[in-house]
UniProtKB/Swiss-Prot annotation:
InterPro entries: Apolipo_AcylTrfase, C-N_Hydrolase, C-N_Hydrolase_sf, LNT_N. Catalyzes the phospholipid dependent N-acylation of the N-terminal cysteine of apolipoprotein, the last step in lipoprotein maturation. The gene is lnt. This is Apolipoprotein N-acyltransferase. Keywords: Acyltransferase, Cell inner membrane, Cell membrane, Membrane, Transferase, Transmembrane, Transmembrane helix.
Length: 518
């Protein structure tokens, strides 16, 4: 008898271990849904198989099942994070990979909480339409939303981003990337029910497909204005190892000016994040001359720079050649804080170090150049460039949809994001970053321009399509004429709030149902 019990326990243990391995593999496969692969169909299929596997699990087992799925998703999907740590942060490769794995494990806690909640709410009915088509999407969406702001947030590879090149992307103009995560989870729930031979659940795909293909475009209030703006996006391709070296400052400035010289016919010239790798006061003569050149050629130059206010330093964007009355009276550049954008959402470790007194002595990784920035205001006016209103986001900020949405208004002509993704080499990180920027264009219904140090530098239309781009890791200038549009998308009007209210209401219903069942 004892032998039989022991054999049964060992078999059950092996099955549990196998389930965790399969969950990890399914999670890892979701990385193929994001750039550069963009195999959008993989995410809902992998999620549906993981959901099907978890149907009969108790809360503890469900937690670890989805923890394994999440760890696979992030360990593979954001494996590029370690590149900056070992290449530029001074950490040995094993240490950088270990830190990346710890980050992936932390991020996996959010899918794990989804699994825990799913099992807790539905212990008596794990095959129901309610569980798969409503409760699971609500839990998944709320945990993804939480991942976007807890501990400053890391809203990378949301499930919704898998649709940036997929057939459902038009829905983002109504419900945003987070709403697409809800839809992906709902589709996964329907597929999981099919594995249990409940085929009628597939009917949920019909209204989703109809809305994506027909209703969403009909609801669009985005219309062309008949006007256009010509832009020139400069990709300097400055080696990251040289970027902050004092002897490289003036060669860098001259390189950007020389590259721009043949494109002074553009309305707006954009240089990337921290293209001028020095405080304004150190390069005042250069700024004065660049301002005069921009005015003489009737163009504007938007450039990344380090600005200073009292004792604080900011990762900023400024506009040279503003053409207002003040500029005409005094052609020199005046650093008065007007027509300037200061980055608000700073990157932990890269731009500020939490517990810096403790962490900075540990390794060079915690002493990266310019890792002591102050935070700009959450809401700042659009930049004005030759009469055009530009809503900016610097690097990491483009991943936060509500922040950019709050900056866009009916008068906004362009979305602008600048970045320096040289930290991540030839990895998938910069390509995923580009994918996120494309989603912001769909959500807000505005063309987007993206200028980077070494790629991806690109122009995106209001539907999220890349219309022009430079090759990565090359020096060059991308020149494009962009048709302007007007109007607001539904997401620009309402944001994520209705979706979050819906998800919260579904959880409340789930709690009431559970209480009644007890």
């Amino acid at each position: 008898m004892l032998t039989n019990i022991r054999a049964f326990a060992q078999q059950k243990s092996r099955l549990s271990a196998l389930r965790l391995v399969l969950a990890f593999i399914l999670g890892a496969s979701t990385a193929l849904s994001f750039a550069p692969y963009s195999l959008w169909i993989i995410y809902p299929i992998a999620m549906s198989l993981a959901l099907w596997q978890s149907e009969s699990l108790n809360p503890k087992a469900s937690f670890f099942h989805w923890l394994s799925f999440g760890f696979g998703c992030f360990a593979v999907g954001i494996s590029w994070v370690h590149v900056s740590m070992d290449t530029f942060g001074g950490l040995p490769l094993p240490a950088s990979v270990a830190l990346m794995a710890l980050l992936a494990l932390y991020l996996a806690l959010y899918p794990a909480l989804t699994g825990l909640g799913l099992a807790w709410f539905t212990r008596t009915n794990s095959h129901s339409l309610w569980r798969n088509l409503l409760l699971f999407p609500a839990l998944w969406t709320l945990t993804e939303w939480a991942r976007g702001w807890v501990l400053t947030g890391f809203p990378w590879i949301w499930a919704g981003y898998s649709q940036t090149e997929g057939p459902l992307k038009a829905l983002a103009s109504i419900i945003g990337a987070l709403g697409l995560s809800f839809i992906i989870a709902m589709i996964a729930g329907a597929l999981a029910l099919c594995f249990s031979k409940r085929y009628k659940s597939l009917l949920i795909l019909l209204p989703i497909t109809a809305v994506a293909a027909w209703v969403a475009p009909k609801l669009s209030q985005i219309q062309p204005t008949g006007e256009s703006v010509k832009v020139a996006l400069v990709q300097g391709n400055i080696p990251q190892s040289m970027k902050w070296e004092p002897e490289a400052l003036w060669p860098t400035l001259l390189k950007y000016m020389d590259l721009s010289r043949e494109h002074f016919d553009a309305d707006i010239i954009v240089w990337p994040e921290a293209a001028i790798p020095a405080p304004e006061s150190m390069v005042q003569d250069f700024l004065d001359n660049a301002n005069k050149v921009a005015n003489l050629n009737h163009t504007s130059i938007i450039t990344g720079i380090i600005s200073r206010q009292q004792e604080d330093f900011y990762n900023s964007l400024i506009v040279l050649g503003n053409h207002n009355q003040k500029q005409q009276d005094n052609p020199d550049y005046e650093s008065d804080g007007s027509n300037q954008f200061k980055k608000h959402h700073l990157l932990p470790i890269g731009e500020f170090v939490p517990f810096q007194a403790l962490l900075r002595p540990i390794a060079p990784f915690f002493n990266l150049p310019m890792s002591s920035f102050a935070r700009g205001d959450y809401l700042q006016p659009n930049l004005s460039a030759l009469g055009h209103k530009v809503a900016p986001a610097i690097c990491y900020e483009i991943a936060f949809p509500e922040q950019l949405r709050d900056s866009v208004n009916l008068g906004t002509d362009l979305l602008l994001t600048v970045s320096n993704d040289a930290w991540f080499g030839t990895s998938n990180g910069p390509l995923q970053h580009m994918e996120i920027a494309q989603m912001r264009a769909i959500e807000l219904g505005r063309p987007l321009v993206r200028a980077t140090n070494n790629g991806v530098t690109a122009v995106v239309d209001e539907n999220g399509n890349i219309t022009a781009a430079l090759p990565q890791f090359e020096t060059g200038v991308l020149s494009a004429t962009i048709p302007l549009v007007t109007g607001q998308t539904w997401f620009a009007k309402i944001g994520q709030t209705p979706l979050l209210i819906l998800c919260g209401a579904l959880l409340l219903v789930g709690f009431i149902r559970r209480q009644k069942q007890q």
